[in-house]
Amino acid sequence: MDDLQDMAPLQLGVSPAMEHAAAALCNLKIEMDRYARGFIGQPYLDDWMGTHGTCAYWGDELLRLAVPFLDWERGVGERFKALVDPRHVLGASIKGLPEHIPEKDVPERIARYAKTLGSSDHVLYFWYKPLGILTAHEGKHRVAFMRAHDQPAIAAWVCEASYPAAERITVIAPNDERDDWLAMLDERYVQVLRRPRVSLLLLQAYGVKVRRWRDLPDMPNEARVRQAMNERKLHRNPKTIAEADRTLDLEVVHQRAHEDAEPVIRTIHDLEHHRFEWRRYGAVLAGCLVIAMILSFVDYPLTRSAGMLLMGIATGLAWGLSLIRFVGRRRS
């Protein structure tokens, strides 16, 4: 094992506002873990996380729920050794809480967590450096333990992960309070803020601005964008952690709007949401045809003329459906 007692603690290098918001989220995670496995505590966690589980959730799951585009640029760097302040780590108390450790084992465990380092299979943290937050991939339980005993640092392997600059992100406030809050990256990619109040606290501390859709130039129709997001159920928990599974590309919306605006030719049978009522139409056509045939056998000029007229009407009705054309937008 490596001795790290002479190493300086990892410096987060973020603004005071971001550091405060990051620490607040980590504090919340500690409290949330205490609800895990509870009779109503676990269902409460499941509802808040938008999924279902049987224990405390991993730190990256919480961060991914609160922060949009979290892994958009996750170019993980080489791992390095560091002493990490547990107040800025999202851990998980999955198998127990700090007070479950026997009192006689506490000093030895504190010394081991604080001063020695094994392999990354034992303790590995991902550092979202621009946000000042670390998530525990391995070594999750020691976060709450070291915090409970007021310890300043955990010896850990750390991998630095990137995050888009604040200038590239815009939070979009809804005009209707019943609509979802959105986050947009590079004026092209959109995600739903499923926990908007928590997300706003973090993103505004990071430096992200809040705007409304109508104030953004060269954007597709907001209703069309929200419809596309609802069709893909982007307001629900995604099936994977891939950013593509929770992101709408506005270029796709632009392309679809262009295609929908193209003029197309339709017959009467192509009218959407309508079914041709053929019985009445067919009855009139058949009636004209039958009467015309009957009148054609009557040897009287006026009757023959009437029969020819009805025959013409029947023929026109028969051909009319195939000749009628409607020109309009592909979609209204």
Predicted regions: what is each one?
Residues S119-A173:
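A short, basic-hydrophobic beta/loop patch
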Residues L250-L271:
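Juxtamembrane amphipathic/hinge helix adjacent to a transmembrane helix
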Residues D2-I133:
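Short alpha-helix boundary/capping and kink motifs at helix termini
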